[in-house]
Amino acid sequence: MGAKVKVAVVQAEPVWFNLQETVKRVNELIESAYNKGAELIAFPEVFVPGYPTWIWTNAADLDRNLMYTKNSLTYDSPEFISIIETVKKYPIHVVLGFSEKDQGSLYISQCIIDNTGEIVLKRRKFKPTHVERVIWGDTADSNMKSVVTLNFKEAGPVEVGCLSCWEHMQPLLYYNSAAQHEKIHIGSWPALNDKDLGVYCFTKAGFHGLARAYANQVQSFYLFTSILGQRIQEALPDVKLSPYFEKGAGCGAVFAPDGSQITEDHPDDFDGVIISELDMDKILLQKNLVDIVGHYARPDMVSLSHNRPNTEFVNRK
C-alpha cells in the first residue's frame, strides 16, 4: 500500500443563480470536507452560480442571461475573497468551478486554490459546448497549463489538474494534461440527467465512460464532480427545460488509474461530499503497464504541437 490522499467530491445543489447564497454553500462544503479529513475538495462545472439550463430550450432569453451575468463571480469580489478566507480557516486544497465575469464577458472557469489560500491555477474552458457559446466565450489565453503541484501530508508533492465537461472529448487536451504528469484529475460537470433519451453520451453511463477512459489513458485518479439538479425546475418555474436537464441526478464518483470505480454510487438526491482515499501506488502500477508520456510513447513519430498566438487586444510597437 502506498501513500494516501483523502479527497472530497462535491455532489451538491447550488442556490440556483444566487451568487451570494451559492458562495455560502461553497464555504459550507469546504468546511464539511475539511472536517471529514479531506485534503482536497473538487467542485462541479459552474457550481457558482449554477448551470443555466434554459439555454438548451431558449438561448435568447435576454432577461435571464442578464441575471446570470450579474450573478457570475469575479476574482476581486467580496464573494471570492470569502472563499479564500474559508480556505485559510479550514486548510484544504480547492478546485472550484464557476462562471467567471471578466468585464462584460463570461467564461466557464476553474481555479485551484492551495491550502494556504493562494490561487495557484486559473483556467477557462477551451471551447464552450454547443449553445453554451451564447453565454460564455472561448478562452483567449494561449497558456495550456492545466496541472499544478500541490503538497499533501502523506503523499508529499502531487500533480493535480482539471478540465470541464466535454473538454474530456478533446484527446489533445487530455494528452496535454498527461504531458504535465497529472496524478489526480478533477473532471467538473454540470447538472446531469440519468435518463437514456436516445443520446448515449448524455447519460450517466456515457459521461462515466469518458471518465474511465481518461483515467486509464492518463493513468491518473479521476474525481468526477457534478451539480445536483433536484430543485432546478423550482428555480425556473416558467421554463420548459430540455429533458436532458430535468431534475439532474447526482453522478459523483472517483475512478482509479485503471478505469475502475472506487466509490459506491450514491442516491440521486444525495447532497454533500463523497469522500474517497486514494492509494498513490495504483498510479505506479498502471504506469508500469502503460505510460503515454513515457515508455509507451514515440515522440519522435507523434507529438502534440502547441501554438502560442498573440492574444493582446492592442499591440503597441
From Swiss-Prot:
It comes from the Eukaryota. It holds the Pfam family CN_hydrolase. Its EC number is 3.5.5.1. Gene3D superfamilies: Carbon-nitrogen hydrolase. The active site is at E45, K125, C165. Keywords: Hydrolase. GO terms for molecular function: hydro-lyase activity; nitrilase activity. Residues 5-280 form the CN hydrolase domain. InterPro entries: C-N_Hydrolase, C-N_Hydrolase_sf, Nitrilase/CN_hydratase_CS, Nitrilases_CHs. It catalyses: a nitrile + 2 H2O = a carboxylate + NH4(+). Belongs to the carbon-nitrogen hydrolase superfamily. Nitrilase family. Nitrilase that hydrolyzes preferentially 4-cyanopyridine. Is also able to hydrolyze some aliphatic nitriles, such as phenylacetonitrile. This is Nitrilase. It comes from Meyerozyma guilliermondii (strain ATCC 6260 / CBS 566 / DSM 6381 / JCM 1539 / NBRC 10279 / NRRL Y-324). The lineage of its organism: Eukaryota, Fungi, Dikarya, Ascomycota, Saccharomycotina.
